[in-house]
Amino acid sequence: VKKYILLNCKRLVSFLKILVSLVFIQSIANYANAKIVSSVKPIGFIAEAIASGVTDTDILLPDGASPHTYNLKPSDLAKLKSAELVIWVGEDMEAFMPTILKSIDNQNQIELMTIPEIKVLLRTSHDVHEHEEHHSADMTAQDHHGEYDEHIWLSPNIAKIIAQSIHDRLITLYPDKSVLVDENLREFNVKLAEIEQNIAKKLITVQNRGYFVFHDAYGYFEARFGLKRLGSFTINPAVQPGVQKVYAIQQELKEHKAVCVFHEPQFSPAVIEKLVDGTDVRIGELNPLGTGIALSKDAYSQFLLKLTQQLLDCLDRN
């Protein structure tokens, strides 16, 4: 009887192993269904607008993940290798991409930072810090690892070029759907022009209200809409800063008469509250990656409008 039970247990374990393997394989296959894969959400929003009704799109990084520190999973590799088109920013933004993309034909990917029309619109690190009014060396930091600010999706002008590049590649991949691709691009450009005008009207009332950020990511958006970023601070988002650091930041906030300081979702509220304690500075949240926004044809517009509202929620309080 014991031998019989033991034999059946072994068979059950073997069966469960096979079942788990099949589920894992199927899950990877499901991940690999999308034909167009974008590295980060805002780029994926643009891709979805142009590819809507043409083919499926997906986004590599999950909500809350940073493109600077992300580690690829097996399902990510399957997704990238099976995609007909991979869209990414550049190696200084997604350091994890170049190695895996060596196995993908150049015709199957768009590295946005290499597009000539985008290159001429790039902001350098020098541009970013000229925009700031203070030069506190031990508290100002570049988020960018390279010479240029690679948060290019925050520029409406560059977004139009990204959309055009995706359009051109889709025409090649799906010539039988060229009419729909053309119409999607036209709709995207019309909608974006309307959104730009809307945002400009909303933000004109807060253009002279200075603020600090904890992520040097918003230069393109700030330049387009004339916003007054005073500078940026660098702290560990999960660790309480020391007394000297807190005092130095508070002095900066007071000296420059900052209205707000903006953090991102990964920052502990307790850390930010400690930094503004004893000042009149308000706390706001900004998100440059579109966290919480679902992938849809209008997602890029929703992304820009949400960012605008986040700015207004803090800067426009009386």
In which residue ranges do the predicted regions lie?
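N-terminal secretory signal peptides that target proteins for export/translocation
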Residues: 1-11
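Bacterial N-terminal signal peptides
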Residues: 14-27
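Extracytoplasmic metal-acquisition and chelation regions
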Residues: 31-318
